Amino acid sequence: MGRHRKIYKKNNSMDVIVDFLQSFADAFNAHNIKAIMSHMTDDCVFEASAGPDFNGEKFTGKQQVKEAFEKVFETFPDAHWGNPRHFVSGDRGFSEWIFTGTKTDGTKVEVTGCDLFAFKDGKISVKNSYRKNRFLK
């Protein structure tokens, strides 16, 4: 995966470091939902990059967030987030990446994107995703 260095920042008496975000990215690339959710707080929020809401579709709580992530893997069985770069500052974090995947209908997607994070008690409390919208034939 991409180069990253440890950056330690205090957060609610817990350390959140860049390696934590890399571990989260690795779990996504492994499609390991249990490992993904171990990085999230019980009251986590996921704001998807698209949807009917102003900030994209919003999922609240571990069960809804888990189901939303599982749907990504169903929609893109080969989903991959490459070339990650992670940053942490206090109770906020940022990851940028290149998403590649093939929808079940054969549509290929390759786009840049990013996640904005809020941390609480050493875990991700909010994952707000943004990505370009470009489809390849």
What label would you give each PLM region?
Residues 101-110:
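Short, cysteine-centered beta-strand-loop-beta hairpins and adjacent loop/turn segments enriched
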Residues 112-135:
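Short beta-strand edge/turn micro-motifs at domain boundaries
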